[in-house]
A protein has these predicted regions:
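Internal alpha-helical scaffold of NAD(P)-dependent oxidoreductase catalytic cores
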Residues: 56, 97-170, 182-220
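Short aromatic/hydrophobic-glycine micro-motifs
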Residues: 6-8, 155, 217, 268
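Short, small-residue-biased leader/transition segments that mark boundaries at the very start
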Residues: 2-3
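C-terminal or late-domain output modules
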Residues: 177-181
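Short polybasic amphipathic segments
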Residues: 7-12, 208
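Rossmann-like NAD(P)(H) cofactor-binding subdomain of soluble oxidoreductases
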Residues: 17-117
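NAD(P)-dependent Rossmann-like dehydrogenase/reductase catalytic/cofactor-binding core
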Residues: 190, 198-297
């Protein structure tokens, strides 16, 4: 109703706020099959609503999920050491996989810092690049064509030949910054400036890099440089901290539980990920914003 009444209000640094008209629908059946369906939901919300998206997805529809963490399809494509691994933490009953044919999916990642202070209001703080690519990797006309369409529409988008790597690169930031901000309720600059939490951040980052490489990814990352880049972003309030403060369910499963599923299958020891997941999970559960469970061992 908010979108129908007032459209989408958008504000960005050094730009006047503007309102974008939106054709909003409460029922997907009223829209019919689309050329492109962009799924920008939090990962934990998708299983409950994915069946309702069926009217949007025709035989030629391209589905572009752009959530944080590891998506359900991440290990379903050939050519990786964990081929066929189904992430129960992300798609617990296989509902997403059944509803969205893998052949119609493009992988996607949004490199931006934004917030939604009120319904129908988006504040864009930094970044803004979108990366899309074939789940199995490699170049494709489909990815290139949609990157051009999105860019022409005002959303700078690049076609990637290794979207799984791009998603893991973003995971490096999410898995370190988000849970630490949830636990400490601090912005990223304070986390990196504090010697104790900086050490935890560094150990998490190092462990996530090693896990990604064990999973077959080529990750050329300098840990100290990545930490410095995080600090240069300034006082970022992560999405997980925003959700905690707003009383919204937090996105721990795709960001921490899914990598831990990967680690378990590879028999890769991940003590920092396990510890931070346990602490962040309990912190969120205490606030009523996450299931009261964790990873044992």
């Amino acid at each position: 109703d908010v979108y129908k009444r007032q459209g989408l209000r958008y504000a960005a640094p050094d730009e006047p706020e503007r309102t974008v008209p939106v054709n909003a629908y409460a029922d997907c059946a009223a829209m019919g099959p689309q050329d492109l369906v962009v799924i920008a939901l939090k990962s934990h919300a998708l299983p409950a609503v994915v069946d309702s998206l069926a009217p949007l997805v025709g035989p030629e529809t391209v589905v572009l999920p752009v959530g944080n963490g590891l998506p359900w399809w991440y290990f379903l494509t050939p050519g990786n050491p964990l081929q066929g691994l189904r992430l129960a933490s992300v798609d617990p009953n296989g509902r997403i996989e059944r509803a969205l044919p893998l052949g119609q999916v493009l992988g996607g990642s949004v490199m931006a810092s934004c917030s939604c202070p009120a319904p129908g209001v988006v504040r864009h703080h930094s970044g803004g690049k979108v990366v899309i690519g074939e789940p199995a990797g490699g170049a494709s006309d489909r990815a290139s064509d949609w990157a051009q369409v999105l860019t022409a529409a005002g959303l700078p988008t690049a076609a990637s030949t290794d979207i799984r790597r791009d998603l893991w690169m973003k995971l490096l930031g999410n898995a370190c910054s988000n849970p630490l901000s949830l636990i400490t309720q601090a912005t990223t600059d304070r986390i990196v400036d504090n010697p104790g939490t900086r050490a935890v951040f560094k150990n998490l980052l190092t462990e996530c890099l090693a896990l990604g490489r064990r999973a077959g990814l080529t990750l050329d990352v300098d840990v100290q440089q990545r930490i410095a880049q995080t600090r240069q972003l300034g006082a970022i309030k992560t999405s997980m901290l925003q959700d905690l403060e707003a009383g919204r369910w937090v996105e721990l499963d795709a960001i921490l539980a899914a990598p831990l599923e990967c680690a378990a299958r590879l028999e890769f020891d991940a003590p920092w990920l396990k510890t931070v997941f346990a602490l962040a999970g309990l912190r969120a559960a205490q606030a009523g914003l996450y299931g009261d469970h964790g990873v044992s061992g």
